[in-house]
Each structure stands twice: as C-alpha cells, then as structure tokens.
C-alpha cells in the first residue's frame, strides 16, 4: 500500500476543517477582542470624553464639533481603499496583528499628552490629540475589511448573527460600566489628569483586546517570527 499524499498547504477543504475544529475557541477569542475593544472606546468616547478634552485644551467650537464626524469618517472611508488590497492577501490574521497596534498605541500617547503636555503646552497637546485620533481611526478603517474576513472564516454563518449580537451586548454592557467609572474618575481627579487616567483605561482594554486576538487559532505565520518552510498556512 502506498500512503496517500498529504493535503496541500493551501487546500481549502483542509482550511475549512481546521476552522471547524477551532470554532468555539475562535468565537471566544474574537468575541473577547471585539467586546474589549468596545469597552476601551467607552473610556475615550468620541462624543463626550474626547470633545471635553479638546475643550479643556482650548479648541474652537468647530474642532470640538468636528471630532465625532472626523472619527466616523476615519473608521469608514479607508475601508473603501483597503478592500482590494485586503482581498489579495493570502492570510489576513498576521496582517491585522501587525498593524492593529496603530489603533491601540495612540491611547498610550494620549495618556502621556494628558499627563505631561496638556498643562504646559495645550496647543501642542491639541495637535497631538488630533494626530493620534486620525492615526487610530485611519488604521482601524484600513484593517476593518481584513478583520471582517477573519470573522467570516472563523465563525460559521449560522453563528455569525449571535456572535455579533452577544459581543455587542457584552461590549455595550461593559461600556456602560466604563462610562460610570469614567464619570467617577473625572469627578475626583482634576483635568487634565483625569483624562489621562481615562486614556490609560482605554489602553488597558485595547491591550487585553489585542491579547485575545492573538489567541485566535491560526495555522499560519505570526508576524513576530519567521515562518518555517514546513509550517502550515493559516486558514485566516
């Protein structure tokens, strides 16, 4: 008898079987990523906290009012230009893991700005704040098609509606608690230090969200190490 040849590294049936074996793990990992991301955003709300911080820095009413619109545009517009490139990627997860850092690090920068720059140089702090918001939302918009593709591959169609419903519910519930904690922090800490604590809480949740995304079961190369020639390819 001759042994049957091994499946090719990019065999779609083999990739689908891998996804089915890890569906529970990936649903939990991606759900935690999404939920924690939403909770992190609640500590730096684009409709309350960020405009209030901009007002503290002396921003004009035009800039304060434009912050939510600019962030919404940043989340959505880049996706139109990134979709074609994302579609050409053989593996989406390493791409997302590599560049989603630029969605998360800006919160640490905002915290540093609030603690060390906002007091002595508010004009510079405002410029840095707007730059970080553009970087964060631009990176998020560019990565959105790839992240949605990962969800589509990892979460079966029959579970997808429940996945987003439960993740949104938990994220919104956590966000409500986050809003309460934010109000408590701002009531007890003078500006801009209170804003800095809020940004640190956002960064903490974003970091935990990143760890959850890293736990997504993958057979492909991770961005932080070189792939061995014999290492199988990621389904996502």
Name each model-derived stretch.
Residues 136-169:
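Cytoplasmic helix-loop-helix junction between adjacent transmembrane helices
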Residues 49, 80-81, 142-150, 181:
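Transmembrane alpha-helix boundary/hinge residues in polytopic small-molecule transporters
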Residues 2-86, 93-111, 165, 171:
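Helix-loop boundary and gating motifs at the non-cytosolic
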Residues 35, 100, 106-113, 121-143:
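Hydrophobic core of transmembrane alpha-helices in multi-pass small-molecule transporters
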Residues 52-53, 150, 212:
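A residue-level signal for alpha-helical anchor/packing sites in multi-pass solute transporters
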Residues 51-56, 83-89, 111-120, 175-199:
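Transmembrane alpha-helix termini and helix-breaking/packing motifs in multi-pass membrane transporters
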Residues 203-222:
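C-terminal membrane-cytosol helix-exit motif in multi-pass small-molecule transporters
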Residues 60-68, 125, 129, 195:
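Juxtamembrane helix-start elements in MFS-like secondary transporters
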């Amino acid at each position: 008898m001759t042994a049957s040849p091994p499946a090719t590294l990019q065999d779609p049936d083999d990739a689908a079987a891998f996804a089915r074996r890890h569906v529970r793990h990936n649903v939990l990992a991606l759900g935690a990523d999404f939920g924690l991301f939403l909770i992190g955003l609640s500590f730096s709300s684009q409709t309350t906290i960020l405009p209030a911080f901009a007002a503290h820095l002396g921003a004009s009413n035009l800039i304060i009012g434009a912050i939510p619109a600019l962030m919404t545009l940043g989340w959505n517009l880049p996706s139109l230009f990134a979709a074609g490139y994302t579609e050409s990627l053989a593996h989406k997860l390493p791409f997302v893991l590599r560049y989603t850092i630029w969605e998360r690090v800006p919160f640490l920068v905002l915290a540093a700005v609030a603690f060390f720059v906002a007091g002595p140089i508010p004009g510079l702090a405002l410029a840095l704040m707007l730059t970080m918001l553009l970087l964060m939302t631009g990176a998020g918009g560019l990565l959105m098609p790839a992240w949605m593709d990962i969800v589509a591959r990892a979460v079966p169609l029959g579970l997808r509606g429940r996945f987003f419903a439960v993740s949104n519910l938990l994220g919104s519930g956590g966000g409500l608690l986050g809003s309460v904690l934010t109000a408590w922090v701002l009531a007890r800490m003078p500006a801009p230090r209170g804003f800095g604590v809020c940004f640190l809480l956002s960064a903490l949740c974003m970091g935990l969200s990143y760890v959850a995304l890293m736990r997504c079961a993958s057979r492909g190369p991770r961005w932080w190490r070189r792939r061995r020639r014999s290492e199988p390819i990621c389904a996502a």
